Amino acid sequence: MEKLTILLLVAAVLTSTQALIQGGGDERQKAKINFLSRSDRDCRGYDAPCSSGAPCCDWWTCSARTNRCF
């Protein structure tokens, strides 16, 4: 009975590995990472130089005196 259990576990691991290789598991993982790490790339963070072409993110304000986000 133990041999059958081990055999089934090995078969399950091999099957899932093969499915990842054939199914583009890396592409799916990269897409998931890109989606989760996506942010508003056009805005500037704290103390970054800002202008009309490179505005501060919504939660920061561009100082007219220093031209920096705060």
From Swiss-Prot:
Residues 20-41 form a propeptide. The keyword Cytoplasm does not apply. The modification 6'-bromotryptophan is found at W59, W60. The modification 4-hydroxyproline is found at P49. Keywords: Bromination, Disulfide bond, Hydroxylation, Knottin, Secreted, Signal, Toxin. Disulfide bonds join C43-C57, C50-C62, C56-C69. The presence of a 'disulfide through disulfide knot' structurally defines this protein as a knottin. Contains 3 disulfide bonds. This is TxMEKL-P2. Pfam families: Conotoxin. It is found in: Secreted. One of its GO terms (cellular component) is extracellular region. The keyword Signal applies. One of its GO terms (molecular function) is toxin activity. Expressed by the venom duct. All three forms are mostly present in part 5 of venom duct (distal part near the pharynx) and less abundantly present in part 4. Residues 1-19 form the signal peptide. Belongs to the conotoxin O2 superfamily. The lineage of its organism: Eukaryota, Metazoa, Spiralia, Lophotrochozoa, Mollusca.
